[in-house]
Structures are given as C-alpha cells and as structure tokens.
C-alpha cells in the first residue's frame, strides 16, 4: 500500500496517539504545522479510508479514526521501496553512500558494527 507524504502526516498522528481520534483532534494535531485547512485533512482521511490504512467508527455525531496499517509495516515497506529504487535492493551501497556523504559519528559507526556482528551471529 502506497501512502503519500501528506497521508503519512495523518498516519503519524494516529500512530502517536494510539487511541481512536476524532477528525477534529486530527485536524488540531496535523493542520497547523502543515498550514492545512480542515478540508485538506478530511480529504486525506477519506483517501486513507479508501486504501484501508485506517478505519472509522461512528461515535454519536462524529467519527473516530484508528490506524489499521501498523507503523512498523509502513516503515518496512517504505525502506524496501527506497532500497529497491535507489540501490537495486542492496544494503551495502546504501551504507557506503551514507558513510561517504554524511558525517557518521563514532556512535553511528558503533551501531552499524554491532548490527553487522548481530547479523553475522544470526547467520551461523
């Protein structure tokens, strides 16, 4: 399932809050920082409903929205898509790119080394 950048802002509100949220709550949490109007957020909610990324249930005169798509699943799909598009699905070139272009701290390097050691142990 492909989620646009704007839709991901709405999803982040639902993931962060965890409990079902009203449209008004979502507007209040997302719209000001993005410069959006209420109608924009409602449009994004409708798109997410059609994609079955969220569900809505009636609560009196309003609807409460909750995430169906788990954040971990979304992050995994987006990460895989980026890796496939830019690096042919290979992690090595991604790490090489970041090590060449970004200032990796000693902590970053230690975390990468620890991850590689853990992966190496798991493969044995």
What are these regions (language model features)?
Residues 42-46:
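Short, hydrophobic-biased segments on the C-terminal half of alpha helices
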Residues 52:
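Glycine-centered, phosphate/nucleic-acid-interacting loop/turn motifs that mediate DNA/RNA or nucleotide
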Residues 56:
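Short beta-strand "wing" residues that participate in macromolecule-binding interfaces
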Residues 12-17, 29:
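Short amphipathic alpha-helical elements of helix-turn-helix/winged-helix folds
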Residues 20-30:
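Short acidic, hydrophobic short linear motifs in intrinsically disordered regions
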Residues 8-13, 25:
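Pre-recognition alpha-helix immediately N-terminal to the DNA-recognition helix
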Residues 77-122:
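Amphipathic alpha-helical dimerization/coiled-coil segments
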Residues 3-6, 59-78:
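Short, cationic-aromatic polyanion-contact patches
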């Amino acid at each position: 399932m492909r989620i646009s950048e704007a839709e991901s802002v709405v999803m982040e509100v639902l993931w962060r809050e965890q409990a079902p949220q009203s449209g008004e709550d979502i507007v209040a949490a997302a719209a000001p920082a993005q410069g959006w109007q209420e109608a924009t957020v409602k449009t994004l909610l409708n798109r997410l409903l059609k994609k079955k990324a969220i569900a809505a249930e009636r609560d009196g005169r309003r609807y409460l929205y909750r995430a169906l798509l788990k954040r971990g699943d979304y992050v995994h799909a987006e990460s895989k898509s980026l890796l496939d598009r830019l690096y042919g699905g290979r992690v090595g070139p991604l790490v090489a790119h970041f090590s060449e272009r970004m200032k990796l701290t000693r902590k970053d390097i230690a975390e990468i080394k620890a991850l590689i050691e853990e992966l190496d142990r798991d493969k044995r």
